[in-house]
Every structure is written in C-alpha cells, then in structure tokens.
C-alpha cells in the first residue's frame, strides 16, 4: 500500500448534538473553525476511499454507547418485532435502487421518498421510546406509517401506478433530506 496521510475517524451519534448535549452543535462549529486554521483537514469516508481505494478490511465488534455496551435498549422484548419489518423495507429499497432507472420525474421523486421513509423508520428513537415506555403508541405509529408508505411506494412503482398527488402529499409531510438520492442504496454506490 502506498503512503497514507494519518486519519482520525471520530463518529458520533447524531442524537447527541442538540438533544443530550445542547452545546454539541457549537462544539462542532468550533472544531471546523479550528480545522480551517490548522495544518490538518477534514475528509468524508467516501473521499478517503476514492483517495485510498485499497484497504485492509476489519470486522468491528458489535457495541453501543447504550446500557451495558450492547443493544439492550434497542433490541428488547418491547421493540424487537420491528427489525424484521425494517430488514424487509431495506431489501425493497436496495432492490429498486439496483433496478431500472426511473422513467420520469414522478418515479424519481417516489424512489427518493422511499429512501426518506426508510431512514425515518430506521431511526433508533422509536425503539428507545418503546423501551423507556414513553409515548409508545406514537413510536409504534411512526414506524408503521413509514414502513407502510415505503411498501406502497414500492408496489406502486413496480406496478407503474404511482399517484402524483399522494407522492406530493407524503413529500410535503415528511421532506427531511430534500437532496436525498435513492441511488445511495445501490450495492455498487462506491
């Protein structure tokens, strides 16, 4: 392998910033300001892999910042049922991402909305809420809504039956990540 500049990977749970650690966004701002004035720079994992495509592969042990260093909070009798649905939804997303290109703008929007629905269903907040027993009904409903919308978008896309008004309605209801790109779920994205 050729010489590589040293790299520090510093991942954080996004929930930490502004939710549990209110000063977190300010901390990040100062990190990036200090970076701009220093002799080191930031890089995304994708940019790193483009620069250094040959890498040693490692298996990382499963761990968590949660109780006991494992996933006790997120995989528990109160919430473990969701994972079979999340896995099936992810499989559907990968299938359409690896499939044919959208024929038109509506299909493209629908696939991007599928990606949004999957990300919103996969947020660990829902399982955390179920475990802690706060707003449990709300958490069940949110996961169910996002999964059902994703499956409906999938079926409508596969059958050529997309309803523009329904797609527009769910886009306006949940339009987080307006620049999302469904192709990121392709197995050949990198």
Q: Could you tell me what each predicted segment is?
A:
Residues 1-190:
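Active-site and substrate-binding clefts of carbohydrate-active enzymes
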């Amino acid at each position: 392998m050729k010489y590589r500049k040293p790299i520090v990977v510093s991942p954080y749970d996004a929930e930490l910033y502004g939710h549990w650690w209110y000063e977190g966004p300010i901390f990040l701002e100062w990190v990036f300001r200090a970076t701009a004035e220093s002799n080191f720079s930031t890089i995304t994992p994708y940019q790193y892999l483009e620069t250094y495509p040959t890498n040693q592969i490692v298996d990382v042990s499963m761990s968590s910042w949660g109780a006991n260093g494992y996933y006790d909070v997120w995989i528990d009798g109160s919430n473990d049922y969701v994972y079979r649905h999340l896995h099936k939804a992810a499989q559907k997303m990968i299938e359409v991402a690896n499939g044919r290109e959208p024929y038109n703008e509506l299909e493209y929007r629908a696939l991007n909305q599928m990606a949004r629905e999957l990300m919103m269903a996969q947020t660990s907040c829902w399982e955390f809420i179920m475990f802690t027993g706060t707003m449990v009904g709300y958490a069940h409903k949110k996961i169910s809504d996002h999964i059902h919308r994703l499956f409906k978008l999938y079926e409508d896309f596969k059958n050529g039956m997309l309803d523009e008004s329904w797609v527009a309605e769910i886009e306006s209801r949940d339009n987080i990540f307006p620049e999302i790109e469904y192709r990121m779920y392709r197995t050949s994205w990198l």
